[in-house]
Curated annotation (Swiss-Prot):
Function per UniProt: Catalyzes the NADPH-dependent rearrangement and reduction of 1-deoxy-D-xylulose-5-phosphate (DXP) to 2-C-methyl-D-erythritol 4-phosphate (MEP).
Top class in the EC scheme: oxidoreductase
Positions that bind Mn(2+): D150, E152, E221
GO MF terms, alphabetically ordered: 1-deoxy-D-xylulose-5-phosphate reductoisomerase activity; manganese ion binding; NADPH binding
Residues binding NADPH: T10, G11, S12, I13, N124, E126, G205
Name of protein: 1-deoxy-D-xylulose 5-phosphate reductoisomerase
Keywords recorded for this protein, A-Z: Isoprene biosynthesis, Manganese, Metal-binding, NADP, Oxidoreductase
Gene3D superfamilies: 1.10.1740.10, NAD(P)-binding Rossmann-like Domain (3.40.50.720)
Listed GO biological process terms: isopentenyl diphosphate biosynthetic process, methylerythritol 4-phosphate pathway involved in terpenoid biosynthetic process
Family membership noted in the UniProt record: Belongs to the DXR family.
């Protein structure tokens, strides 16, 4: 039996991970789980999965949950805030941690888990975007596996299995193109929140849905792929694939291309990471090629969807520039979701921040500098609104 902690258990990835655990015939067990403030959802999880530990980032929510557990004589231990997240990420009795928190908040507990020598099922892409060098170095030092949960990176991981990385020629990351595929800049002036959240293929959380609409999600995945697979940015290609059947591809030095195909179901890469490459039965819809009918591929429009272009630029510059990119994007997306800025303002804010904070990139890449700069960039974005 494999014992797990899930950071961000009430979100989209966390919820689907629970379904994987439920269908594992007792081979997977939830030991620790964290959420931000969703008390009612966490109560349901306690009742169904009986985790030994739960953590809430919001202290008031933790107090409510603790009261619930005491009144019903539940043995679940309730922890709170970042200290609680870090403890649940590094529990002695667990084997693997799923980090499915959204944003920079996932960095610190991920590092704590790695230091505790826990394998990481990584769904929090921002961790590698801002601190890829630190995370991969720490993972190597502690002999920890970083197992990708993003469908694209899981596809690459699977396509690389059994082959020498030295023979890798190119990584081809596929993207659905989001809800605005084919549109030009002038078509994006009056985009509302509901329009941007309406992803054609994937059922995702609000923040990642907006990132998919701007193509920033693919930009973050480019940086993530660079660190996961030690691949130069010039050898990472993004291809628009609206059917979302080919999850990504790998081109080898002889020109051969290996791809991973499957239904658009996040439970597949989650289960693959949990079982560390061992194939297990999963009751899910499989791919029917008669239904698919055709597979098409297009070049991304980098002039319209500038965030993807900016992500390549930030990744190539390295150091603290990806922290600026990510912090500006997180803050801008939050403002857009609150209907305080327009859709295209997200693009302009990211570029503005990359120019404004250029001098900050001369500082060394440390955890302290990453956290400090992230706060500084986000405050700047909120203040400029």
């Amino acid at each position: 039996m494999k014992k797990l902690s899930i950071l961000g258990v009430t979100g989209s990835i966390g919820t689907q991970a629970l379904d994987v655990i439920k269908k594992s015939n007792g081979e997977l067990k939830l030991i620790g789980a964290t959420a931000n403030s969703s008390v009612n959802k966490m109560i349901e999880i306690i009742e169904e999965f009986n985790p030994k530990y739960v953590g809430m980032m919001d202290k008031n929510s933790a107090d409510k949950l603790e009261k619930y557990c005491k009144e019903r004589n539940k043995q679940t231990i309730v922890l709170s805030q970042m200290e609680g997240l870090n403890k649940i990420a590094s529990l002695e009795e667990i084997d693997i941690v799923l980090t499915s928190l959204v944003g920079m908040i996932g960095l610190e507990p991920t590092l704590e888990a790695i230091k505790a020598k826990k394998d990481i099922a990584l769904a929090n892409k921002e961790t590698l975007v801002v601190a890829g060098e630190l995370v991969m170095s720490e993972a190597k030092k502690n002999n920890v596996k970083i197992l990708p949960v993003d469908s694209e990176h899981s596809a690459i991981y699977q396509s690389l299995r059994g082959n020498d990385l030295k023979t890798l020629n190119k990584i081809i990351l596929t993207a659905s193109g989001g809800p605005f595929r084919g549109k030009k800049l002038c078509d994006l002036n009056d985009i509302g929140v509901d329009d941007a959240l309406n992803h054609p293929k994937w059922n995702m959380g609000r923040k990642i849905s907006i990132d998919s609409a701007t193509l920033m999600n693919k930009g973050l995945e480019v940086i993530e792929a660079h660190w996961l697979f030690n691949c130069d940015y010039d050898n990472i290609q993004v291809v628009i694939h609206p059917q979302s059947v080919v999850h990504s591809m790998v081109e080898y030095c002889d020109g051969s291309i290996i791809a991973q195909l499957g239904a658009a179901d996040m439970r597949l890469p989650i289960q693959y990471a949990f079982n560390y490459t061992e194939r297990k039965n999963l009751i899910a819809k499989t791919l029917d090629f008669y239904e698919v009918a055709q597979l098409t591929f297009e070049k991304p429009d980098l002039e319209t969807f500038k965030p993807l272009k900016l992500a390549f630029k930030a990744g190539k510059q390295g150091g603290l520039m990806p922290t600026i990119l990510n912090g500006a994007n997180e803050a801008a997306v939050a403002l857009f979701l609150d209907e305080k800025i327009e859709f295209l303002d997200i693009f302009n804010i990211i570029e503005n921040c990359m120019n404004t904070f250029e001098e900050e990139t001369k500082k060394p890449l440390t955890l302290e500098n990453i956290i400090e700069l992230d706060k500084k960039v986000k405050k700047y974005v909120v203040d400029m609104k």
